[in-house]
Amino acid sequence: MILILLGPPGIGKGTQASVLSYILKINHISTGDIFRKNFKENTELGTLSKKFIAQGLLVPDDITNQMIADYLSKDIATKDFLLDGFPRNVLQARFLDDFFKKSHLFLTKVIYFNAGTKDLMKRIAGRRICPECGKVYHIEKIPPKNPGICDKDQKTLIQREDDKPETFLKRLKVFNKETLPLVQYYCEQNQLFEVDGMQTIDQVTKMILEVLETDRK
């Protein structure tokens, strides 16, 4: 089983990815984790990426594509995983299609989490993240056991710069321009399932599991 999760920033893809990977017993492959791994190991691709990020620029598709392909090639033995954060545009999606074809892999479903801007702004305002392990919390919906402290490593939680209102709106604009066309791309391939991302975590999970079960029959 191979799943792709799509949705605007702040919709909760990472949370849902963790839940689904646990229930379905498949690997959760996060683009953010792959980048952090390359940064930590000082790989050539990681070093190149840092140069663009330091200038406030998007990492070029060819670098991101190669980074993802390298990771998947090493971890391909399971052939069961979900992708969170990739592809981000149609060119990356076409690259991924070619990679799957060459690797004899088959995409099961693309899950698109939809929500309005006002709802997303409200949700993003309460989001907090651990600077050490990257675990995401929400002060109302997914609070830590101790306010402001990560359950895993006891680090003080922070609000990412990306989650501050002015930065978030810029990210949303980029999403609408670059990533939203993927909805049409995968819809035309009859691989898209759209879900209301503002429902509870359990409700969203239930809907996704039901559509996956239907596809298996």
UniProtKB/Swiss-Prot annotation:
Residues 126-163 are annotated as: LID. Residues 30-59 are annotated as: NMP. Its main location: cytoplasm. GO terms for cellular component: cytoplasm. GO terms for molecular function: adenylate kinase activity; ATP binding; zinc ion binding. Disulfide bonds: none annotated. It is found in: Cytoplasm. ATP binds at G10, I11, G12, K13, G14, T15, R127, V136, Y137, Q199. It holds the Pfam family ADK. Transmembrane segments: none annotated. Pathway: Purine metabolism; AMP biosynthesis via salvage pathway; AMP from ADP: step 1/1. Zn(2+) binds at C130, C133, C150, D153. Keywords: ATP-binding, Cytoplasm, Kinase, Metal-binding, Nucleotide biosynthesis, Nucleotide-binding, Transferase, Zinc. Consists of three domains, a large central CORE domain and two small peripheral domains, NMPbind and LID, which undergo movements during catalysis. The LID domain closes over the site of phosphoryl transfer upon ATP binding. Assembling and dissambling the active center during each catalytic cycle provides an effective means to prevent ATP hydrolysis. Some bacteria have evolved a zinc-coordinating structure that stabilizes the LID domain. Monomer. This is Adenylate kinase. It comes from Aster yellows witches'-broom phytoplasma (strain AYWB). The gene is adk.
